[in-house]
Amino acid sequence: MTEPLRIVFAGTPEFAAEHLKALLTSPHDVVAVYTQPDRPAGRGQKLMPSPVKQLALEHNIPVLQPPTLRNAEAQAELAALNPDLLVVVAYGLILPQAVLDIPRLGCINSHASLLPRWRGAAPIQRAVEAGDSESGVTVMRMEAGLDTGPMLLKVTTPITAADTGGSLHDRLAELGPPAVIQAIAGLAAGTLEGEVQDDSLATYAHKLNKDEARIDWSRPAVELERLVRAFNPWPICHSTLNGEALKVLAATLAEGAGAPGEIIGASKDGLLVACGEQALCLTRLQLPGGKALNFSDLFNSRREKFALGTVLGVVAQ
């Protein structure tokens, strides 16, 4: 067995924290953790530490939160840690070449897609939105480009017809950490070779935008059904009903015709809404001031709100 490595970890959200947990139970030494500065969150907008910071503090690991790693001071601080390897998972900052050159064995990244497909910020949601049949985690050696480095390991998982952005996230958060541990072992032993990405196959997973979550009922129902799943639990697809906000948390593909956004059926099975092609059966909704409910519960208590012929939302022209 090779000697334990001095590892610096850089990550921010829960997906990254799962990877840090695995490193903390490995033979290697996590000597410091980098994470994004604390951000305001919740109704009170109190400053909240990231999941990675919370985990690091629980294990008495030094936490660094520089707003950038592009200046000489931040780079000198990293170099002083004398890391063998920098492990990066959903950190949120671009690492300049000067940083990538500091660790003895370089820098690796766990990315939640099967690269080169879905480089970028939101690979999990974009894979569901696009109707991909599979996803996975790629562990790659980092270089200055965005998710362009040589691929060291891949693990795959099917995307099911029931998967949401949340369920796929959770599955990939389980698959990624063991792959990172395996990749570290290969790098330490000098037995792992990287596979160059084919840039001609690259697609980009642009950052999620809340405006994208507004449902355009003129789109085909098959696209909207995937969007509803992809954007759950955030940013949640939404429309309006009689001028009030309506969040759509779950829906199924259905047959039916009418003006886009028109309610063409309502029963305990769901709210049937016409789309540009086919229809969506909305099965879980949230009204203003209320909690998310299955439509069967809303149908029993608020049936009058869902009159046939009512048109949801603003249809794009």
Swiss-Prot record:
One of its GO terms (molecular function) is methionyl-tRNA formyltransferase activity. Its EC number is 2.1.2.9. (6S)-5,6,7,8-tetrahydrofolate binds at S113, L114, L115, P116. One of its GO terms (cellular component) is cytosol. It catalyses: L-methionyl-tRNA(fMet) + (6R)-10-formyltetrahydrofolate = N-formyl-L-methionyl-tRNA(fMet) + (6S)-5,6,7,8-tetrahydrofolate + H(+). PROSITE patterns: GART (PS00373). Disulfide bonds: none annotated. InterPro entries: Fmt, Formyl_trans_C, Formyl_trans_C_sf, Formyl_transf_N, Formyl_transf_N_sf, Formyl_transferase-like_C_sf, GART_AS, Met-tRNA-FMT_C. Keywords: Protein biosynthesis, Transferase. Attaches a formyl group to the free amino group of methionyl-tRNA(fMet). The formyl group appears to play a dual role in the initiator identity of N-formylmethionyl-tRNA by promoting its recognition by IF2 and preventing the misappropriation of this tRNA by the elongation apparatus. Belongs to the Fmt family. This is Methionyl-tRNA formyltransferase. It comes from Pseudomonas fluorescens (strain SBW25).
